[in-house]
C-alpha cells in the first residue's frame, strides 16, 4: 500500500517515534514523514507509507499554520522552554506593545535566521550537533513569509497566545526571538501546535492509537484532482522507462498524472523546464 496518514502527534514524542510506532502497528516496510515536528510541539504530522515516501517533497513546499504561546523575558539556548535557560530580563511589556510587534510581522517577508538547535545543515553537519559541541558558526538566513500573524490572548505573566500562517522553512522559535527583539527583550516558545499543512487539517488527523488502515490516503486518491494525460500502449512503455515528455504530448503547464488507456495510474510528471516534464513518481 502506498499513501499518507494524517497523524495528530502528541507532545514529548519525536517525529521519528511516530514513524516507528506506525511502522510497528501496521507492519509496513517503508514509512517516513514529510517534515519534523519538534518534541515540544503537538499537532499535524503527515506520514508517508510505501512508495509514497518518495513524495515527501510535495508537502515540504506547502505553507503551515500553527497556534501556541510565546514566553517573553527569558532566553533559552534552543529558543523554547525545553532548552537551557541562559539569561532573563525584566522588561515591562503591555498589550499595545505586543500587538504593535505582531502587526509588524503580519504579511511580512523577511530573512530569518534558523535556531542553532535545528536540523539545518552547515557544511554537511546538522546545526544541533554543532551546538551540542559548543561550536559557534555563522548561520545563513533564509527568506520566509508570514502570511498571517494574530495575537489570540491578552498579555499576562509574560505570555501571549498566537495564531500564525507561514511559508515553508519558517521556524516559529525564531519568530518568537525576532518578535521579542523588537521589544528589546528575549522571546521563546512555550507551547506549539501545528493545525494545518497546506489544505490538510489537524481536525482530519487521528492519534496513533486511533489510526486504522482505512485512514490511509492512497496515492491515487491524493492525485485525483491533478490534470491527467491518457497515452497509448506504446507511449506508456516509454513512460515506464523514464521518458521525458514535452509540448508535443501535453497541453498543461503544471504537474500532471499519466494514465494508460484503461485509466490506470502510471506516473506523476513534474516540471523540468518551460517545455519539458519528467517522471518523478511511478504508481
UniProtKB/Swiss-Prot annotation:
E.C. number: 5.4.99.25
Keyword flag Isomerase: yes
HAMAP family associated with the record: TruB_bact (MF_01080)
InterPro entries xref list: PsdUridine_synth_cat_dom_sf (IPR020103), PsdUridine_synth_N (IPR002501), tRNA_psdUridine_synth_TruB (IPR014780)
Pfam families noted in UniProt: TruB_N (PF01509)
Disulfide bonds: none
Assigned keywords, A-Z: Isomerase, tRNA processing
Highest taxon of source: Bacteria
Phylogenetic classification of the source organism: Bacteria, Bacillati, Mycoplasmatota, Mollicutes, Acholeplasmatales
Cross-referenced NCBIfam families: TruB (TIGR00431)
Gene Ontology biological-process entries: mRNA pseudouridine synthesis; tRNA pseudouridine synthesis
Annotated function: Responsible for synthesis of pseudouridine from uracil-55 in the psi GC loop of transfer RNAs.
Enzyme class: isomerase
UniProt key word Aminoacyl-tRNA synthetase: no
Record family assignment: Belongs to the pseudouridine synthase TruB family. Type 1 subfamily.
Active site: 38
An example Gene Ontology molecular-function term: tRNA pseudouridine(55) synthase activity
Reactions that this protein is recorded to catalyse: uridine(55) in tRNA = pseudouridine(55) in tRNA
Taxonomic source organism: Aster yellows witches'-broom phytoplasma (strain AYWB)
Protein name: tRNA pseudouridine synthase B
Amino acid at each position: 500500500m502506498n499513501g499518507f496518514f494524517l497523524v495528530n502527534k502528541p507532545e514529548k514524542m519525536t517525529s521519528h517515534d511516530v514513524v516507528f510506532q506506525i511502522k510497528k502497528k501496521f507492519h509496513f516496510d517503508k514509512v517516513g514523514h514529510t517534515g519534523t515536528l519538534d518534541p515540544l510541539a503537538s499537532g499535524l504530522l503527515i506520514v508517508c507509507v510505501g512508495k509514497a515516501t518518495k513524495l515527501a517533497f510535495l508537502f515540504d513546499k506547502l505553507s503551515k499554520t500553527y497556534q501556541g504561546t510565546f514566553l517573553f523575558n527569558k532566553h533559552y539556548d534552543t529558543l523554547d522552554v525545553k532548552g537551557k535557560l541562559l539569561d532573563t530580563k525584566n522588561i515591562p511589556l503591555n498589550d499595545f506593545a505586543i500587538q504593535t510587534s505582531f502587526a509588524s510581522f503580519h504579511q511580512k517577508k523577511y530573512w530569518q535566521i534558523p535556531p542553532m538547535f535545528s536540523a539545518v545543515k552547515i557544511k554537511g553537519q546538522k546545526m544541533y550537533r554543532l551546538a551540542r559541541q559548543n561550536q559557534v558558526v555563522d548561520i545563513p538566513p533564509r527568506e520566509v513569509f508570514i502570511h498571517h500573524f494574530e495575537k489570540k490572548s491578552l498579555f499576562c505573566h509574560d505570555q501571549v497566545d498566537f495564531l500564525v500562517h507561514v511559508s515553508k522553512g519558517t521556524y516559529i522559535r525564531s519568530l518568537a526571538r525576532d518578535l521579542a527583539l523588537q521589544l528589546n527583550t528575549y522571546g521563546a516558545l512555550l507551547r506549539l501546535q501545528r493545525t494545518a499543512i497546506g489544505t490538510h487539517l489537524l481536525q482530519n488527523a487521528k492519534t496513533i492509537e486511533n489510526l486504522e488502515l482505512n485512514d490511509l490516503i492512497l496515492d491515487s486518491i491524493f492525485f485525483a484532482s491533478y490534470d491527467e494525460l491518457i497515452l497509448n500502449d506504446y507511449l506508456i512503455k516509454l513512460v515506464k522507462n523514464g521518458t521525458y515528455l514535452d509540448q508535443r504530448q501535453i497541453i498543461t503547464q503544471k504537474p500532471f498524472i499519466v494514465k494508460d488507456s484503461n485509466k490506470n495510474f502510471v506516473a506523476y510528471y513534474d516540471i523540468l523546464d518551460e517545455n519539458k516534464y519528467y517522471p518523478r513518481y511511478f504508481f
